[in-house]
A protein has these predicted regions:
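Loop-to-helix transition at the N-terminal end of transmembrane alpha-helices
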Residues: 24-38, 53-59
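Alpha-helical transmembrane segments of multi-pass membrane proteins
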Residues: 16, 29-39, 65-73, 94-102
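Hydrophobic alpha-helical transmembrane segments and immediately flanking/interface helices
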Residues: 78-106
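Membrane-proximal cytosolic segments adjacent to transmembrane helices
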Residues: 1-6, 96-130
């Protein structure tokens, strides 16, 4: 039992080191990724297109998002050696906008009305990160 705890602690520390601070932006990204996956599954059920293969590919894509955050963090701290995390922050904002728009698309496919203000905010973030 203790070995499992140590391994999990080691993995958690390594991941935390690679992705940088577990700050509000990173937590928001985790939340958006989880909500996008859940709404994607709900949409697939609603449209009767649920597929374990598509779901597995979706999970792999979500993992790649966090790999790219880690790459951006390494660029910031070990290649560019800049204060703060401008590259990491930009990558997180890009994926926040991307995941947010995907969430809206998934929910809209369920015939749920989407507040225009929310759509505009996410589209503006997306434009700013392009």
């Amino acid at each position: 039992m203790y070995k499992v705890k140590y391994v999990l602690a080691l993995v958690g520390a390594a991941v935390g080191y690679m992705v940088g601070d577990i700050d509000g932006l990173f937590i928001a990204l985790i939340i958006f990724v989880v909500i996008d996956y859940i709404t994607g599954v709900v949409k697939a059920i609603y449209l009767r297109k649920l597929s374990s293969e598509v779901g597995a590919v979706g999970i792999l894509k979500k993992i790649c998002i966090f790999i790219l955050v880690a790459v951006a963090n390494v660029i910031d701290h070990y290649i560019m050696k800049v204060g703060g995390s401008p590259c990491r922050t930009s990558v997180i904002f890009f994926y926040l906008a991307n995941e947010g728009i995907s969430i809206l698309e998934n929910i809209a496919a369920l015939d749920v009305p989407i507040p225009e203000k929310l759509r505009n905010i996410l589209e503006n973030i997306d434009k700013d990160t392009q």
